[in-house]
Curated annotation (Swiss-Prot):
The gene is pyrH. Pathway: Pyrimidine metabolism; CTP biosynthesis via de novo pathway; UDP from UMP (UMPK route): step 1/1. It comes from Lacticaseibacillus paracasei (strain ATCC 334 / BCRC 17002 / CCUG 31169 / CIP 107868 / KCTC 3260 / NRRL B-441) (Lactobacillus paracasei). This is Uridylate kinase. Belongs to the UMP kinase family. Allosterically activated by GTP. Inhibited by UTP. It catalyses: UMP + ATP = UDP + ADP.
Amino acid sequence: MVKYNRIVLKISGEALAGEAGFGIKPPVIATIAKQIKEVHELGVQIAIVCGGGNIWRGETGAEMGMERAQADYMGMLATVMNALALQDNLESQGVPTRVQTSIEMRQIAEPYIRRKAIRHLEKGRVVIFAGGTGNPYFSTDTTAALRAAEIGADVILMAKNNVDGVYSADPNKDTHAVKYESLTHMDIINKDLKVMDSTASTLSMDNDIDLVVFNLNEPGNIKRVVEGQKIGTTIEGRS
């Protein structure tokens, strides 16, 4: 029995890099794919949004004096590279997967078409949304919120790299930091908790989409969240 039937899984680029912090670490992405396969076998419809921070970060562009829009487009291309790597790992484990990009590159992926994405999900295929929203100035967190609203997802799963939930402060720097079990999107905005940017939080709140923040590095955690086990922090869509 699962709590969520259709999910958007947000995976940061850094999570794919493991301890290396850069690039794609083969054992790490294989382990993530295995966790996704476990959830797929439950009959859950899975859409994924990948970040690109393991390949390109906006700060690098800023240091180079690059225009923000140009740097953002480079970040979008980085997410496509991550999506293709994850697709390959999933399919090698027997999970049918499609990549859809917000910027057309038909030789390697389908263009994003909402109805087609939903059809893939209904047929039991994992869909990876790459290329962000296709527009600069929008984060991949906002992409996750946007795609979740478009496909009617029950929840966004924010799979974090060695972070097991939302805290009142950085637990690595503040010994008095308190972990929250549940919050609302308005709490996130008012307390400035940096779970996701304000655009993504507002979009999730306006469309009544729940969010679960949890540690991706603990094997089996994606499955536990989908089954409704109390791990991480749950952020309710309603304010």
